[in-house]
Amino acid sequence: MFSQKLLANGKLLSKLAIVSGVVGTATAITTSTTLLSDDFVQPTSYPWEHRFPWQSYDHAAIRRGHQVYTQVCSTCHSLNLISYRHLANVAYTPEELKAMAADTTVMDGPDSEGDMFERKGQVTDFHPKPYPNSNAARFANNGALPPDLSLVIKARGAHEDYVFSLLTGYCEPPAGVRVVGGQYFNPYFPGTKIAMAPPLADGMVEYDDGTDNSMSQMAKDVSTFLCWASEPEHDDRKKLGMKVLLGVSIIALPLFYWKRLKWSVIKTRKISFKD
């Protein structure tokens, strides 16, 4: 009945055809735009130990990664959500953190007279920002705004694989690819042209524990540190999950026996009818 009315109404059919054409064209444009923008290499999936359900973060790697961030990455990138006290008993002792924070200068205030003043850093302070505002950051980086690294691992689909591949993936552009001044070729960056110069090189950071300071090792350590920074509760969450699973498994056996005991009478009963 509906199909007959639809065929009889020519105007309705023409409108439906126009709408279908517009939707199809929009879908094709969106698809082609997505394909054109996806001109970068997908990062390799690496076997990070902390990804396994029973594994925690490598806390020695977190300490080394924080050292790489402090000496290399902090010159351009902020870490707004991590204070020094967050690293206590994770990568440093409280005494080490107090000394580390005291080496920084923090703008505080206002005082009783309404003026801002400088003071030594405390463990409750967050890591200092490299630039006072976003305009200063853009001016110092050829118009590019260095992202905050607190949640950069969560903000990328490949997570720590992306950060590691990006840091170690700088190379010469292939034939036919033009890179203007102030940009560098990196096949793992969307668009393949990035304003950040290669940040790491072999031997750039001297580790306190004597670990090999190759570029790949530093990239691995700072990726682990940033992964922890994006999810500091990772280890506690896994510990709680293991406790819950252990408790449930212990309770499950007596509950199963109790269920069999209570339902055995109902499941095995027989009803007979007398004539």
Curated annotation (Swiss-Prot):
Cofactor note: Binds 1 heme c group covalently per subunit.
Highest taxon above the source species: Eukaryota
Major localisation: mitochondrion
Gene3D superfamilies from the UniProt entry: Cytochrome c-like domain (1.10.760.10), Cytochrome c1, transmembrane anchor, C-terminal (1.20.5.100)
CC terms in the record's Gene Ontology section: mitochondrial inner membrane; respiratory chain complex III
Domain Cytochrome c, residue spans: 60-212
Mitochondrial matrix side: 259-275
Record's protein name: Cytochrome c1, heme protein, mitochondrial
Organism expressing this protein natively: Dictyostelium discoideum (Social amoeba)
